[in-house]
Amino acid sequence: MSIHASAIVHPSAQLAEGVEVGPYAIIEEHAIIGKGTSIGAHAVIGKWTELGENNQIYHMASVGAAPQDLKYKGEECWTRLGNGNVIREFATIHRGTVTGHAETVMGNNNLMMAYSHVAHDCTVGNGVVMANAATLAGHVTVQDNVILGGLVAIHQFVTIGAYAMLGGGTLVGMDIPPYMIATSGGKREAQLRGLNLIGLKRRGFSDEAISGLKKAYKTLFMAHLKQADAIAKIRSEIVGCAEVDTLLAFIEASQRGICRG
């Protein structure tokens, strides 16, 4: 363990072996820092924050600060990160609220680039990339292996499906289905642009899965059918494709409605 002499570590904080704490960093009460995690200069780890192993918190980042919610009155709520995350300079993650999940959760191997923001009660999966200044409002869910371009802004309670990609500057007010690309494209809010084909191929999705998703996309968004009729048609025509089943289940579970082209 290496703690710079100018760092401030609260006596109740728990630091595992191999943790490095840089100059002027602050680690507040009840924080838990896992093995091999590094905290950069001037970074702040707020109280009730749990970091797993081998995370890299760069200088000036803030993880676990109080939520920007006027209803919050200092109740015990948590921020929890898994392993292998990279939080770049000036990125911010806020803890949960008692009116939400009482915790903000991030999984493993995510990258938050500079000035990106994860608000209270968000759930971020694994392998997510948030480019510079991408912003999640409160209660947002981002599933695994999503890519958010720079300056993306996502409304409260929106869900972004796994393997989706959002182009830079996209404004998102409705759920984005898994496997899709969406951009604002000069419009005020996001529009679907098709499947994230390059991303799916890079991730090793089979030709059969991609073919099934293409067919499902055309039926859902290009056949001018009611959503329930489109889903029924797809289920009768595409059997045994897990990716298509995942897509349909996501759409049926959506609470905010689905972004369309």
Curated annotation (Swiss-Prot):
GO terms for molecular function: acyl-[acyl-carrier-protein]-UDP-N-acetylglucosamine O-acyltransferase activity. One of its GO terms (cellular component) is cytoplasm. This is Acyl-[acyl-carrier-protein]--UDP-N-acetylglucosamine O-acyltransferase. InterPro entries: Acetyltransf_C, Acetyltransf_C_sf, Hexapep_transf_CS, Lipid_A_LpxA, Trimer_LpxA-like_sf. Belongs to the transferase hexapeptide repeat family. LpxA subfamily. Pathway: Glycolipid biosynthesis; lipid IV(A) biosynthesis; lipid IV(A) from (3R)-3-hydroxytetradecanoyl-[acyl-carrier-protein] and UDP-N-acetyl-alpha-D-glucosamine: step 1/6. It is found in: Cytoplasm. CDD domains: LbH_UDP-GlcNAc_AT. Its EC number is 2.3.1.129. It holds the Pfam family Acetyltransf_11. NCBIfam families: lipid_A_lpxA (TIGR01852), PRK05289.1 (NF003657). Its main location: cytoplasm. It catalyses: a (3R)-hydroxyacyl-[ACP] + UDP-N-acetyl-alpha-D-glucosamine = a UDP-3-O-[(3R)-3-hydroxyacyl]-N-acetyl-alpha-D-glucosamine + holo-[ACP]. Involved in the biosynthesis of lipid A, a phosphorylated glycolipid that anchors the lipopolysaccharide to the outer membrane of the cell. Homotrimer. Keywords: Acyltransferase, Cytoplasm, Lipid A biosynthesis, Lipid biosynthesis, Lipid metabolism, Repeat, Transferase. GO terms for biological process: lipid A biosynthetic process. It comes from Trichlorobacter lovleyi (strain ATCC BAA-1151 / DSM 17278 / SZ) (Geobacter lovleyi).
